[in-house]
Amino acid sequence: MKDYYAILGVSREASQEEIKKAYRRLALKYHPDRNPGDKEAEERFKEINEAYAVLSDPKKRAAYDRGHLEAPEYRPEDLFDLFFQEVFGVRGHRRPPRGEDLEAEVEVELQDLLHGAEKEVRYTRLVPCEACGGEGGRRTPCPTCRGQGVVESYRQSFFGTVVTRTACPHCKGRGYLLAETCPACRGRGRVPREERVRVQVPPGMDEGHLLRVPGYGNLGPGGPGDLYLRIRVRPHPHLERQGPDLVYRLRLGLAQAALGARVVVPGLEGPIPLDIPPGTGHGEVFALEGGGLPLPGGRGRGTLRVVVELAVPKKLSPKAQKLLRAYAEEVGEEVAPEGFWERLKGFFRK
């Protein structure tokens, strides 16, 4: 993904005010009207607007910072609208607005991220009211803006005469007033409807990644918005995820660690045999290359790390105690005398 901070020439810790200031300066510098016929300047102008569209939105910026935002797509008219709104405080030209973007969650299993998986998501979006055809009721043209939805004023700038179009304060930019309100949608023109969409979750997706589904947001006069699906990975009963790597905590008994053992560890594609060498200590790690999740760009897979945790028994049979005391004597380790803890407990009971 592009480095939007570098495009605007700001640091990753930049405030919203600093981002806005940098955007205005660069947008004016590379505006096509200032650079007629310059294709490079035109591309820079698009990049600058694209970067600002993401970094000026706190939710999109947070997702971008975590690397969880898919590359957005913007129509050229959206970028020019953004320029006029941010630089001059007005929209460049009037057209029916798109519906709002929506966000929902899609839950996946860890195994789903190995090869990718198709998932069905249920969510609710706004669609035109069938009772009134999306009009909200019986409409009459607004007398203030004569049905245009905007009022115009003119000002001079270094671009020449700039026509400032602002939303009509009487009809709030709609261009009409409601003579009668539709009872089904209460004049809103849209009603909620439960939808289903099937999406393909790519391999290796991170927790919290935003998966963009174009055209599945709320429906508006200018077309639908987009649906963003936030990836939620259900916890695995045995494996922990650390980026593309997986971690399995293997509990070994004292005898297994000292003498070595052949064990089986769980993997995403089935059990994996593992030979534990004699003398393995607590905290040792065995790296099984290729046992993790897919790496970005098809560069193979991460590592399954098996972390050894020694399981010290809390209770021993008399025979096991005798064998351990014999071992301690053999290697010269000092241990508590036999019956010491029982005598100590009895002392405190008195």
Curated annotation (Swiss-Prot):
* Cofactor(s) this protein cannot do without: Zn(2+)
Q: Where are the zinc fingers (CR-type)?
A: 116-194
CXXCXGXG motif repeat start and end residues: 129-136, 142-149, 168-175, 182-189
Chief subcellular site?
cytoplasm
Subcellular location, record wording? Cytoplasm
Q: Where does Zn(2+) 2 bind?
A: 142, 145, 168, 171
Key word Protein transport present: no
Give a yes or no for keyword RNA-binding in this entry.
Answer: no
Q: Name one GO cellular component term.
A: cytoplasm
Residues in J domain copies? 3-68
Q: What HAMAP family does the entry give?
A: DnaJ
Give the family per the record.
Belongs to the DnaJ family.
Protein name from the UniProt record: Chaperone protein DnaJ
Whichever gene encodes this chain, its name is dnaJ
